[in-house]
């Protein structure tokens, strides 16, 4: 078990070489973010199974955009509001919210999984519900570019069309 603040591109291979899988945990803000990116890059380049939850999934998207798609300045608007590549962005309905108390997307939400995906394999069904607690989402304006580069959007909310799962 490694705290992401202790990981970087220089030590990730040595520290993670014996891992059978990597979990990138949820969180908020900048703390440990570069270590999460280092772990994700190592996992992707070495075919180590990886699960990113909430901010962890967002970091997967950012790392992929930077290192596979060549969008070196890709980021979340939570970390860098002026990033030229807003691959993770504040939900549209959140952009004018000034009172943050109780403003997050909370509770269980429907998600439809694509058959043949690893997520479908794990759940054994197409319709699932998962709980949420966040305000930032995968920016669907980039969906086609991500899928063309090999990151597939395999879980989607049927009402909002928000991407919930990527592989």
Briefly describe each language-model feature range.
Residues 6-9, 30-32, 58-61, 137-139, ...:
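Flexible loop/turn segments at secondary-structure boundaries
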Residues 3-5, 28, 115, 142:
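Short, flexible loop/turn elements at secondary-structure junctions
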Residues 15, 106-167:
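C-terminal and late-domain segments of enzyme folds
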Residues 1-13:
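A short, well-structured beta->alpha microelement
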């Amino acid at each position: 078990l490694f705290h992401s603040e202790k990981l970087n591109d220089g030590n990730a291979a040595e520290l993670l070489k014996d891992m059978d899988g990597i979990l990138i945990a949820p969180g908020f803000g900048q703390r440990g973010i570069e270590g999460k990116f280092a772990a994700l890059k190592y996992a992707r380049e070495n075919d180590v199974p990886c699960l990113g939850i909430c901010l962890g999934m967002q970091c997967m998207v950012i790392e992929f955009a930077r290192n596979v798609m060549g969008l070196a300045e890709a980021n979340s608007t939570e970390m860098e509001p002026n990033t030229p590549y807003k691959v993770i962005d504040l939900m549209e309905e959140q952009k004018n919210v000034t009172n943050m108390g109780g403003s997050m997307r909370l509770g269980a939400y429907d998600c439809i999984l694509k058959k043949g995906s690893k997520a479908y394999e794990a759940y054994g069904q197409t319709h699932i519900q998962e709980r949420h607690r966040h305000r930032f989402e995968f920016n669907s304006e980039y969906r086609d570019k991500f899928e063309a580069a090999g990151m597939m959007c395999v879980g989607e909310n049927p009402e909002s069309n928000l991407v919930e799962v990527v592989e």
